[in-house]
Swiss-Prot record:
Naturally occurring in which organism (per UniProt): Arabidopsis thaliana
Gene: REC2
Extent of Basic residues compositional bias: 1-17
TPR repeat segments: 892-925, 934-967, 976-1009, 1018-1051, 1060-1093
Residue span(s) of domain Clu: 329-603
Pfam families per UniProt: CLU_N, eIF3_p135, TPR_12
PROSITE patterns documented for this protein: CLU (PS51823), TPR (PS50005), TPR_REGION (PS50293)
Name used for this protein in its record: Protein REDUCED CHLOROPLAST COVERAGE 2
Region annotated Disordered, chain positions: 1-23, 128-180, 595-619, 634-664, 1152-1360, 1413-1456, 1468-1513, 1527-1573, 1616-1670, 1731-1809
Disruption phenotype: No visible phenotype. Reduced proportion of the cellular volume devoted to chloroplasts leading to an abnormal chloroplasts distributions. Lower levels of chlorophyll, especially in plants lacking REC1, REC2, REC3 and FMT/CLU.
UniProt xrefs under InterPro entries: CLU-central, CLU_dom, CLU_N, CLU_prot, TPR-like_helical_dom_sf, TPR_rpt
Length: 1819
């Protein structure tokens, strides 16, 4: 363990530190490479890359992947650049490939590469051709078909549940089945039958291209003598048969390849030659390259694989006796299984001496340790490889020679060999499964000491550990334990070497790694095949009797082993002495130090007593304070002096005791110095734990107490919070071992995890796997003839995993379970009965067994429901399993943990700095392509993702995935995590189809490992949902969301934050279907959970409140539409109040139609009021999209009906009568007093992401995520727009403090309310005399405005003012099945009545108990906003049917509801309208239209100071004035508002101009990005991540990047491209007011080069016809497990914790609540016709600017802190919102913009990212 950082380091000034760290920030670099054929390839690299990395990038690029033997030259640096050259030093970054001559070895390697590239067409079994997922139907069928993805239901149905909750499992199947029946119709049946875990046969389908014609059938060395004389440069000849079946002979020479006798055709590359001489090869190879690009155009090509997974490649199943190697490992062409030391040249190495020199090397500074660690890593890796080779070699000899016959008792003894310094001891395993042998690398047998001595040794090592603990412990460093084929070998260095002074000066001479650490030893390559070669005829001749006899013998052997072992186990005494792992001591010290530091911090905060502040004293005041302090100190001393004499007698006895104590301490100190080194003792004293005053025995007892009372409960608590999220036994073991916990405590973990069924399930499965492992190992050890091993293993697996069908099988089943129960009881101290766990995840158990015992199986769909699922030939081989100490860089791991901790706290700049340093450290120690480094790449990718730099994140994660696949295995948890994370990154880069491939692969592996009932799986469901929604499959997305909800409810509880996140995601999904009343119900549950768990002050709670308010307003809009006479949809669902998941699913069943209609008739409430416009559901969709996506970090849960009911009850208590069922006449409003409102915070620990970070982007624009470099320089938030490649640059998501005003901007909603506003511009139609731009205000806009004003007036903790009673909706069934956007939901509207609640605009604070006040404020703001809009309309348009709705008085009790007095409201509304209209005398019609569309924007952002943003400024000002006036005059009372305006009480005026949905649609298509259809500012909250690691380790989700603009404006116009909505996604959901992602956290602006995505760049209006889609930027799930790959836990929290949002901008200014104007310097392309392509909702012309200076000044009051942001954002149209090619400018917009009213300048209220829409694909 590393010592506490910073103790010995001098303090640096903050500025100094920042400067230094800024230098290490990585950036994306484009590397241009010229190929030999003079074409150019552009690679995307990172500034930390070297020439070695460029070679790797070339190897995974389709144009250059077949090049192997070349050097790289640079016009300045010269030729043959070394692999270590940094690419940042190459100016310009343009390289040239120079072909080099071949040696025979290199020519062989070149052929191996070609075979490797084409292997995917033959080696990985059957595959399906890719299917385009553009149409809903196709995607529906493809849901489970895209590579490996399956619907959650499939997995649920097929994979057995945890066994601990079989009942939920059944209901789950049933409800999901119902859902499938409706949404997938005919496909549902097959979906349910297809269960991923049972489809092991599809394991390799993800990599298989067998649907293509193999370009090459074979390549062989030619055995024919060449006809011509062999040339001097010729190396050898090969025979090639290409795809057409035509054979060719090719000569390999030093200069290249050519057909014999045709040297004029000489080509340096074999591919080029074959393309010239064979058209069929050319066509087949070209088709393969195209398939590679379709698979993943950014890299991660499916070759370079090694057979390193327990499931062998399908090609092996055809010839198990020969095991055809994959090309990389094919010895015929120079391949091998990796590693070093095969040749035996290291047999005589002086290991003892070199380990001793390592331990003596200087290691005081990080630099010294890095040098030492590099040598230690290389030496130890070499030692491990040599040891494994030697051990396996000796074991194979023993097994083949049958030297260890079981009939000879002596044979069970040791077989020992000595090889140089190495001693290899091999022993046959005991066929007794109950035998417990300690064969750990640091166990009693290896170290040859007793248990007590071992416990003391490990504890002392742990409590004195530092960065060098591993290297200094040479006795364990030099040990490897290998188990293989029923034997165990212990390899250790002969003896410790005593160094003298001369040796200390020596250095270790060791070779560097080849290929940067890639191609490490694949232990599977050392397999022992279990089938001897035999001809097919001999197999056919075998009689069935022989096979059945063999099976009978094997079965009796298995039965005998179990029976004998069970007898011995039952009489085995319980073990009393428990060992101690050294990690426990290290964690214990850290725990105590953390406690001490927290106490000291609390004391610091408590000690200083607040002194009364006396202002105006200046320096004299400070002087007086100092004098007073001195007097106090003197007085204190004199008092002590007076007391002293009285205590003299006591002092004498005390001194005697003191002497005695000192004597004891001296004795203990002497003893300690004998036990540990002097430096270790000093470390122990400095640790301030007091351990140096205790004896070892006392410490052991204390450590055991810490273990039981603290360590175990803390582990379970971290499981519950999802800070740790193990997905299988391996990750569970790693987490426990890293904390020093023993696996024998699994029983205790199960007891403590009573409320965590997924953790209990993992523990139970791991205990069962271990019980099975002992049986299987004993059976293998008991087999006398190696030829019978395969049969015995298959028979044993049948007994353990099969389903009994006959009497004999039933008996075997009985004794098997008796063994398991007894084993668990004896070894784990837990009483378990298998009857309570009917359904086990048998494939998970099979996988665990294969890992632990070392089995390789054929990939096929094993029928576990039969008695004999396994056959002899299914068991291919046994592979060695070995253990050793891990040796890497402790400093690197510490930096990784620091990075993760910073990420958790939202300190993105620090997280990037630490992550970059950690990566550099691990690259220096382990090499860039070693499995240890992959964890650093992965973590840094997640950190960069949170900063919004998706390009860089993707590049790093691709590197990690490539390493994990090739070095760790295709189903390793780290590999799984990389698939999931990469899917999220691709999604954020708007490559939805590609993202779906990878997320489905991750989901397939999750089902295989942890099953469907796991938080990581639920989190992945949410990611799949958002991607499915992006592919226009809204109903499929809903099914995944329901699955996630049920899963989270079942696993984490109905009141867990993750469950709330699932409710929230579903609420957004429903809103996309216009089912707002259902959204309200689900969001109410979200809010209640968050209020109870986090409190009303938490940002997530506030966000949820904002969303609820938004949904309520939308539901009211629907009610208004209903009054207009639009067809009344089915209200059956909404009338039921909050529905449980199963109830919702019931609505999807076919027979529910009648019930739904009945319910509809009953539930239809009567509504008073005049018809208003029917709003378009545009922004909501986005909202949903984003939100669904955002759950990325969440793991969704779902709850049963009962849970829902109980939840609803509690909700009703907290939020009075949220249940819509209790609705009274709809014309009455029920004001509900929610306790507090919550929203998901992107950075939250629970995986919540900010719903709507401060920035919102302008409504209409459909923008792409801005991918910019991370700029940590706080001096300038804005970065120069990078126009070079049209890259979008930095998005800063501003954050605001809770006291700042939260103002929503039009179109870019900072809160859900703002979304409502967005709608107002929606109806801007030019062809209508009542200009749609000024669109008559309808209730929707009124609500929006009210929300906006509300935000202005309200303090951060917003209370949801209205509980909407929505009554008239389509049935859930109709909603779920209807294509997105086809159903217009209409809900009878209830207008809220509100009481007066004067508030200070600047920092009004609302008490939690004062919701009524908040409600009143909301109403007032609503009125103001509406008034503004109506006024504008009056000025330039004909007024049509305005509906004025006034809020009648509300009593203080939120429960009381009064009728809305429409008439009174109308009377009072007009005066205000007139006043407002007069306020804007000089505005042109178009300007006013723009303003109206922006009225919503009023809240937009306080950055009104922008010179170009006068328009929005005016709007804000007007709205503020209105709000003020209203607030002041509510109920006739006038209060001073910040603006000082007061006016008679007015009511909300809602313009009732009726507008058809189709009109709105037309309008939408006309909009340009900036003023585009009032894009309801929907930002989707992204949920904090996980376990991506998402899995922290592997399970988790990525929260949306902190730095991403919270809202990407979405153009609601439909787009034809398949990923339309993806580009328009908004990263976060609406947010009421300040608050950072988590609690703190700086949003770091990054200039990120855009990732290639050319398909959606053009901006034709007709392109926007696609259905709405979820926010692509929504946070995705990255399962949140904390460990770094390779079992090095980065931190208990996992990598992916969402960052905490700090409220400081990049330039150090506090973020404005509405700082929408974050400059996003995206280079913007101006439309060629010279028109700004879209109106910017707040951008004003120079004309307006002069007219509204006063107002902009006033606006500064509203948000001064936005000033900095605003100034930058308002600069030029380049920074502005002027749209690139998003949408063609319509004539209407042209008119609006003619007057210059809306130039492209960016205004502070504009949240558009300035992103350039066109992104070129460069890779």
């Amino acid at each position: 363990m590393a010592p506490k950082a910073g103790k010995t380091k001098p303090h640096k000034s903050k500025g100094e530190k920042k400067k230094k760290e800024e230098k290490v920030l990585p950036t994306v670099i484009e590397i241009s490479v010229e190929t030999p054929d003079e074409s150019q390839v552009t690679l995307k690299g990172i500034s930390t890359d070297r020439i070695l990395d460029v070679r790797k990038l070339l190897a995974v690029h389709v144009q250059t992947c077949h090049f192997t033997n070349f050097s790289l030259s640079h016009q300045v640096r010269g030729t043959k650049l070394k692999d270590s050259v940094d690419i940042v030093s190459l100016k310009p970054c343009h390289l040239t490939i120079v072909e080099e001559d071949y040696t025979e070895e290199q020519a062989t390697a070149h052929i191996r590469r070609l075979l490797d590239i084409v292997a995917c067409t033959t080696a990985f079994g059957p595959s399906k051709p890719p299917v385009s997922r553009t149409l809903p139907k196709d995607s529906e069928k493809k849901e489970s078909g895209s590579t490996d993805g399956d619907s959650p239901t499939e997995k649920d149905a097929g994979d057995s549940n945890s066994g601990l909750s079989p009942k939920p499992k059944e209901s789950e199947k049933k409800s999901v089945g119902a859902c499938e029946a409706q949404s997938a119709e005919g496909a549902a049946k097959s979906d349910i039958d297809m269960c991923p875990p049972t489809r092991l046969g599809q394991f390799y389908e993800f990599f298989s291209f067998s649907y293509l014609t193999p370009p090459i059938q074979y390549i062989r060395r030619s055995v024919r003598p060449s006809k011509e004389d062999k040339g001097l440069d010729d190396l050898f000849q090969i025979d090639i048969k290409v795809s057409s079946g035509k054979p060719f002979t090719v000569v390999a020479s030093r200069t290249g390849f050519y057909p014999p006798g045709k040297q004029q055709l000489l080509c340096h590359s074999l591919v080029e030659l074959l393309q010239q001489i064979s058209r069929p090869f050319d066509a087949a190879y070209d088709a393969l390259m195209k398939a590679f690009i379709e698979h993943n155009k950014f890299g991660n090509l499916p070759y370079g694989f090694r057979a390193n997974t327990w499931v062998v490649p399908p090609v092996v199943a055809d010839s198990p006796s020969t095991f055809p190697s994959l090309p990389v490992e094919d010895e015929t062409w120079g391949g091998d299984g990796g590693g070093v030391g095969r040749s035996g040249k290291y047999d005589k190495r002086k290991w003892a001496k070199e380990f001793a020199i390592l331990a003596a090397m200087p290691c005081k500074t990080p630099e010294e340790r890095q040098v030492r660690d590099r040598k230690a890593f290389l030496l130890h890796s070499l030692f491990v490889d040599v040891s494994v080779f030697k051990a396996v070699e000796i074991i194979k000899k023993i097994v083949e020679n049958n030297q260890c016959s079981l009939k000879d008792p002596a044979a069970l003894g040791f077989h020992e060999e000595r090889i140089g310094d190495l001693i290899v001891r091999v022993a046959r395993d005991d066929p007794d499964a109950s035998a417990k042998l300690d064969r750990k690398s640091d166990g009693t047998q290896v170290l040859e000491i007793s248990q007590e001595e071992l416990a003391q040794r490990n504890l002392l090592k742990g409590i004195t550990a530092d960065e060098s603990a591993t290297v200094h412990d040479t006795s364990t460093l030099g040990v490897v334990v290998v188990r293989h084929c029923g034997c165990t070998a212990i390899v250790k260095v002969a003896s410790e070497f005593k160094l003298n002074d001369g040796h200390i000066l020596q250095d270790i001479d060791i070779e560097d790694q080849s290929e940067g650490g890639a191609n490490a030893l694949n232990v599977n390559s050392l397999r022992t095949l279990l089938h001897k070669s035999s001809t097919p005829s001999s197999l056919a001749q075998r009689s069935p009797n022989a096979d059945s006899e063999q099976i009978r013998v094997a079965k009796s052997l298995v039965r005998k082993v179990i029976e004998d072992s069970l007898k011995k186990l039952e009489i085995e005494p319980s073990r009393y002495s428990k060992p101690i792992r050294w990690e426990l001591g290290a964690c214990w010290v850290q725990h105590l130090q953390n406690q001490a530091s927290s106490k000291s911090e609390s004391k610091k905060t408590e000690d200083p007593k607040p002194e009364p502040a006396v202002k105006g004293l200046g320096k004299q005041g400070a002087l007086l304070k100092e004098i007073k302090r001195k007097i106090d100190v003197k007085a204190n001393k004199t008092e002590q002096g007076k007391e002293a004499p009285a205590n003299d007698t006591d002092n004498t006895s005390e001194t005697e005791d003191q002497k005695e104590l000192e004597k004891q301490n001296e004795e203990i100190e002497k003893m300690w110095k004998e036990l540990v080194t002097e430096t270790a003792y000093q470390r122990l004293k400095e640790s301030e734990t007091g351990f140096h005053l205790k004896s070892p025995k006392e410490l052991i007892e204390m450590a055991r107490k810490y273990y039981t009372d603290t360590a175990l409960p803390k582990l379970v608590a971290d499981f519950g919070s999802l800070e740790l999220s193990p997905v299988d036994g391996r990750t569970l073991t790693d987490f426990m071992h890293t904390r020093g916990l023993q696996m024998h405590s699994l029983g205790r973990v199960v007891e403590l995890a009573e409320k965590l069924p997924h953790v209990q399930s993992l523990c139970v499965h791991e205990m069962i796997v271990r019980a099975y492992k002992h049986i299987l190992q004993a059976v293998v050890a008991a087999v006398e003839n190696t030829a019978d091993v395969a049969t015995s293993i298959a028979t044993c697996l049948n007994v353990l995993l099969g389903t009994p069908s006959d009497t004999e099988s039933v008996y075997d089943e009985k004794i098997k379970w008796t063994w398991v129960e007894t084993f668990i009881s004896k070894r784990f101290g837990w009483d378990w009965k298998h009857e309570g766990c009917q359904e086990l995840r048998k494939f998970s158990i099979l996988r665990g067994l294969s890992h632990k015992v070392g089995l390789e199986l054929v990939p096929k769909d094993y029928e576990m429901d039969t008695s004999y699922p396994f056959k002899k030939f299914d068991i291919i081989s046994m592979v060695p399993v070995y253990k050793h100490v891990a040796c890497s860089s402790a400093d690197g791991r510490t930096l990784l943990e620091s990075s993760k901790t910073s990420l958790d706290k939202g300190k993105l700049e620090d997280a990037v700095n630490y992550g970059t340093k950690a990566l550099a450290k691990l690259v220096a120690v382990c090499g860039p392509y070693h499995r240890m480094t992959a964890g650093a790449y992965s973590l840094l990718a997640v950190v960069l993702y949170h900063t919004g730099d998706f390009n860089q994140a993707t590049i790093y994660q691709q590197k990690a995935l490539d390493i994990n696949e090739r070095e760790l295995g295709l189903d390793h948890p780290d590999t799984m995590k990389s698939y999931g994370d990469l899917a999220v990154f691709y999604y954020r880069l708007q490559h939805t189809e590609l993202a779906l491939k990878y997320v489905n692969r991750a989901l397939y592996l999750l089902h295989l490992t942890c099953g469907p009932s796991h938080p990581n799986t639920a989190a992945t469901y949410i990611n799949v949902a958002m991607m499915e929604e992006g592919m226009k499959n809204a109903h499929v997305a809903l099914r995944y969301l329901h699955e996630a909800l049920k899963c989270n409810q079942r696993l984490l509880g109905a009141d867990h934050i993750q469950t709330a996140a699932s409710y929230h995601a579903i609420a957004i999904a429903l809103s996309l279907m216009d089912a707002y009343s259902l959204s309200v119900q689900h969001e109410q549950t979200t809010l209640q959970i968050l209020q109870a768990k986090l409190g009303p002050e938490d940002l997530r709670t506030q966000d949820a409140a904002a969303w609820l308010e938004y949904f309520e307003s939308k539901a009211l809009e629907q009610q208004e539409a209903a009054r207009n006479g639009t067809p009344k949809p089915d209200a059956s669902i909404s009338s039921k109040g909050h529905l449980s998941v199963s109830d919702l699913l019931d609505y999807i069943t076919p027979d529910s139609g009648i019930k739904a209609r009945d319910a509809q008739r009953k539930a239809r409430p009567k509504v008073k009021g005049k018809p208003g416009q029917s709003p378009g559901p545009v922004s909501e969709e986005n909202q949903k999209d984003d939100e669904i996506l955002s759950p990325a970090h969440l793991t969704g849960e779902s709850s049963s009906d009962k849970e829902n009911k109980s939840e609803t009850k509690s909700e009703e208590k907290k939020v009075e009568n949220f249940d819509l069922e209790q609705s009274k006449p709809q014309d009455q409003l029920k004001l509900v007093k929610p306790e507090a409102t919550v929203h998901e915070d992107d950075d939250s620990d629970e995986g919540w992401q900010e719903a709507v970070p401060k920035n919102r982007f302008s409504s209409g624009r459909r923008t792409r995520p801005s991918l910019a470099k991370l700029n940590t320089n706080f001096m300038n938030v804005t970065q120069q727009p990078s126009r070079s490649r049209g890259k979008s640059t930095n998005f800063t998501s501003p954050r605001t403090s809770s006291n700042e005003l939260s103002i929503s901007v039009a179109g870019s909603t900072s809160s859900p309310a703002s979304k409502m506003f967005v709608k107002s511009p929606l109806n801007k139609k030019q062809n209508n005399s009542s200009v749609v731009g000024e669109r008559p205000v309808n209730d929707k806009s009124a609500l929006a405005s009210s929300a906006c004003t509300e935000q202005i007036n309200k303090p951060t903790p917003m209370l949801s003012p209205v509980s909407v009673k929505a009554g008239k909706l389509f049935s859930y069934k109709e909603v779920a099945l209807a294509p997105p956007g086809t159903i217009v939901k209409i809900v009878a509207e209830q207008l809220p009545e509100e009481t007066k609640a004067p508030q200070n605009l600047d920092a009004a604070k609302i008490a939690v108990d004062g919701p009524e006040k908040v409600n009143a404020q909301d109403a007032e703001s609503e009125n103001k906003h509406v008034a503004t809009e109506t006024e504008a309309e009056n000025t330039d348009c004909n007024e049509q049917g305005r509906v004025v709705v006034g809020g009648s008085e509300l009593t203080s009790s939120p429960k009381e509801i009064k009728n809305v007095e429409v008439e009174k409201a109308a009377e009072k509304a007009f005066p205000i309208e007139t006043a407002v209209s007069n306020a804007r005398p000089g505005k042109s019609k178009s300007a006013q239209m723009a303003e109206d569309s922006d009225t919503c924007l009023l809240n937009k952002s306080p950055t009104a100071n922008d010179s170009n943003g006068s328009e929005s400024v005016i709007g804000v000002k007007l709205q503020k004035d209105l709000c003020d006036a209203e607030l002041k005059t509510v109920d006739g009372e006038t209060e001073n508002l910040p603006n000082g305006d007061s006016s008679p009480k007015s009511s909300v005026a809602a313009d009732g101009e009726k507008q058809d949905a189709c009109e709105a649609q037309k309008e939408m298509s006309k909009k340009l990005s900036a003023s585009a259809p009032p894009y309801t500012p929907t930002t989707i909250p992204i949920f904090g991540s996980i376990a991506v690691p998402g899995f922290k380790d592997h399970g988790g989700i990525l929260p949306s990047p902190l730095n991403m603009p919270p809202m990407l404006p979405i153009n609601h116009v439909r787009r034809s491209t398949p990923h339309q909505s993806v580009t328009a996604r908004v990263p976060y959901g609406p947010r009421l007011s300040g608050g950072g992602y988590n609690r703190s956290g700086n949003r770091v602006p990054r200039n990120k080069p855009s990732f290639p995505n050319s398909t959606e760049s053009n901006g034709e209006a007709n392109q926007f016809n696609g259905p709405r889609i979820m926010n692509p930027h929504a946070a995705e799930f990255i399962p949140s497990q904390p460990w770094v790959s390779n079992g090095y836990p980065v931190s208990p929290n996992g990598y992916l914790a969402s960052p905490n949002g700090a409220e400081i901008t990049q330039n150090g200014y506090p973020l404005s609540p509405v700082a929408g104007g974050y400059p996003c310097n995206m280079s913007v392309t101006q439309p060629q016709d010279g028109l700004v392509s879209e109106e910017l909702p707040g951008a004003g012309s120079s004309e307006e600017k002069s007219g509204s200076e006063e107002e902009s000044n006033n606006d500064k009051n509203a948000g001064e802190d936005d000033e900095a942001v605003g100034q930058e954002t308002t600069d030029t149209p380049e920074n502005g919102h002027s749209t690139v090619g998003e949408v063609e400018t319509t004539s209407h917009e042209t008119c609006d913009e003619k007057n210059g009213e809306r130039q492209g300048g960016k205004c502070w209220g504009d949240y558009s990212d300035n992103e350039i829409e066109q992104i070129e694909v460069t890779s």
